[in-house]
C-alpha cells in the first residue's frame, strides 16, 4: 500500500515537472518569436515579458521611433492575445477608453441603453504617450488597471483575462504633458528604458524592414498558456537568500537608518508593493531563462526597473548631479 502511494506521488511530481517544463518552453518560444521581429532590444523584450508573466503592467520610456508600438503588436501576436492601441491626447475622455452607454430604440418602439465597450477591453493594451492625457483620463485607465474592471453608469464590466497595459512616455517633450503622480506610477510593475539599437542591430533593421518581405511574428502561446505560466510563476520556490536580498534592497531605498549614508539623498522611497513586484519579477525572469528558482543575480538585474519610478531624490542630491540609477547602483553594490 505504501509503495503504491509512493509511486502515485512520484507520478504526480513527474506530471508537475513536465507541465512546468512545457510552460517554460512556451515562454522561451514566445521570447524567440518576439526577438525575431524586434532587433537590438533584447533587454526591453525580456523585461516586457517578465512584466506580463508577473501579471503586471509596464511603463516604456523612450524617444519616438524605437519600435515601442511594434513591440506591443508583436507581443500580442506571439502571446496569442487580443491587442489594442490608444493614442493619448489632451482631449481624450475617460469614455473614449472605458466605453459608453448609448440609447437604442427597437423596431417596436422600446428604448434601452446598450453598453459599447472601449479599447480598454483588450488583453494587451498599448497606452501611447499616456502623459499627454488629462489627469482625469489617466486616472480612469489606472483605476481599471488596478481593479481589473470598469464601472459605467453604475454597471460593472469585468475586463478580459489576462489584462495587461504597456504604456509609453517620451522623455524629451514635456510641453503639454501631465506627469503621472507617484501613487499612479506605483501601479506599474516596471519602468523600462527603451534605448537606441547598436550598430549591427540597426543594420539588420534596415535590411529587414525596407525589403519586399518584412519578418512577421508567429503565435507561440495562447491566452490560456499565458495564464498557466502566470500561475506557475507564483508557485516557483524562492530561496531565503533571494528574499533577504529583496528586503535589504527595497528597505535601503527608503530614507532612514537602513539606507545609511545614502539615506540623505532619498526624499521618498518604495513601499511594500515594490517588494511584491520584485518577488514576482525574479521568479518570472528565472522561468524565462528555463530555471525553476530565482537567484540573487535576478534581484540585481531587475532592481532598477522595479524601483526607479518608486523613489525620488532630495533637491540637494539632484543639485549635486546624483541620479536615481546611480543611487540604486550603490544600493545593489551592497548586496552583490
What does each model-identified segment do?
Residues 128-129, 140:
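Walker B catalytic acidic pair
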Residues 2-21, 28, 256-336:
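C-terminal engagement/docking regions of AAA+ P-loop ATPases
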Residues 47-50, 104-126:
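Conserved alpha-helical scaffold flanking the Walker A/P-loop in AAA+ ATPase domains
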Residues 16-24, 37, 177, 191-262, ...:
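Conserved C-terminal "switch" segment of AAA+ ATPases
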Residues 49-90, 103:
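Walker A/P-loop
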Residues 63, 97, 168:
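P-loop (Walker A) phosphate-binding loop of NTP-binding proteins
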Residues 104-109, 133-137, 145-236, 283-285:
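Canonical AAA+ ATPase core
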Residues 19-63:
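Pre-Walker A (pre-P-loop) alpha-helix and adjacent loop at the N terminus of AAA/AAA+ ATPase modules
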Amino acid at each position: 500500500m505504501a509503495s503504491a502511494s509512493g509511486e502515485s506521488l512520484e507520478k504526480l511530481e513527474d506530471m508537475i515537472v513536465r507541465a512546468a517544463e512545457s510552460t517554460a518552453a512556451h515562454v522561451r518560444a514566445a521570447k524567440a518569436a518576439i526577438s525575431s521581429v524586434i532587433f537590438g532590444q533584447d533587454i526591453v523584450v525580456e523585461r516586457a515579458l517578465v512584466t506580463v508573466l508577473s501579471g503586471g503592467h509596464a511603463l516604456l520610456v523612450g524617444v519616438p521611433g524605437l519600435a515601442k508600438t511594434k513591440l506591443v503588436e508583436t507581443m500580442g501576436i506571439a502571446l496569442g492575445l487580443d491587442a489594442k492601441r490608444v493614442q493619448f491626447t489632451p482631449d481624450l475622455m475617460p469614455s473614449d477608453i472605458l466605453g459608453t452607454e448609448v440609447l437604442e430604440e427597437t423596431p417596436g418602439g422600446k428604448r434601452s441603453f446598450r453598453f459599447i465597450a472601449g479599447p480598454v477591453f483588450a488583453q494587451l493594451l498599448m497606452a501611447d504617450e499616456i502623459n499627454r492625457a488629462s489627469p482625469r483620463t489617466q486616472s480612469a485607465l489606472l483605476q481599471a488597471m488596478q481593479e481589473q474592471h470598469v464601472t459605467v453608469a453604475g454597471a460593472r464590466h469585468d475586463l478580459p483575462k489576462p489584462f495587461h497595459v504597456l504604456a509609453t512616455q517620451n522623455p524629451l517633450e514635456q510641453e503639454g504633458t501631465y506627469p503621472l503622480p507617484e501613487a499612479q506610477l506605483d501601479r506599474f510593475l516596471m519602468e523600462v528604458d527603451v534605448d537606441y539599437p547598436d550598430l549591427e542591430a540597426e543594420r539588420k533593421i534596415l535590411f529587414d524592414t525596407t525589403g519586399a518581405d518584412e519578418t512577421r511574428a508567429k503565435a507561440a502561446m495562447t491566452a490560456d498558456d499565458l495564464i498557466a505560466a502566470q500561475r506557475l510563476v507564483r508557485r516557483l520556490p524562492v530561496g531565503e537568500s533571494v528574499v533577504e536580498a529583496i528586503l535589504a534592497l527595497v528597505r535601503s531605498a527608503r530614507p532612514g537608518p537602513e539606507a545609511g549614508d545614502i539615506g540623505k539623498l532619498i526624499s521618498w522611497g518604495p513601499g511594500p508593493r515594490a517588494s511584491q513586484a520584485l518577488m514576482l519579477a525574479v521568479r518570472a525572469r528565472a522561468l524565462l531563462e528555463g530555471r525553476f528558482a530565482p537567484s540573487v543575480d535576478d534581484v540585481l538585474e531587475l532592481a532598477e526597473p522595479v524601483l526607479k519610478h518608486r523613489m525620488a531624490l532630495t533637491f540637494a542630491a539632484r543639485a549635486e548631479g546624483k541620479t536615481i540609477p546611480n543611487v540604486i547602483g550603490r544600493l545593489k553594490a551592497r548586496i552583490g
